[in-house]
Amino acid sequence: MRVRNSLKSAKVRDKNCRVVRRKGRVFVINKKNPRFKVRQG
C-alpha cells in the first residue's frame, strides 16, 4: 500500500477504485485489482 499526499489522481486510475474513510484516514481500495490500494494521512 502506498501513502500519498493527494488521492485525486489515485481514485481515477481504475473504474473499480472506491474512496473509503477508516479511523480518520482516507483509503482508495480496489477489490478487483489490489495493486491500486492507496492511503492518505
UniProtKB/Swiss-Prot annotation:
SUPFAM superfamilies: Ribosomal protein L36 (SSF57840). The keyword Isomerase does not apply. The keyword Transport does not apply. One of its GO terms (cellular component) is ribosome. One of its GO terms (biological process) is translation. GO terms for molecular function: structural constituent of ribosome. Coiled coil: none annotated. Keywords: Ribonucleoprotein, Ribosomal protein. It holds the Pfam family Ribosomal_L36. NCBIfam families: PRK00831.1, rpmJ_bact. PANTHER family: 50S RIBOSOMAL PROTEIN L36 2 (PTHR47781), LARGE RIBOSOMAL SUBUNIT PROTEIN BL36B (PTHR47781:SF1). Belongs to the bacterial ribosomal protein bL36 family. This is Large ribosomal subunit protein bL36.
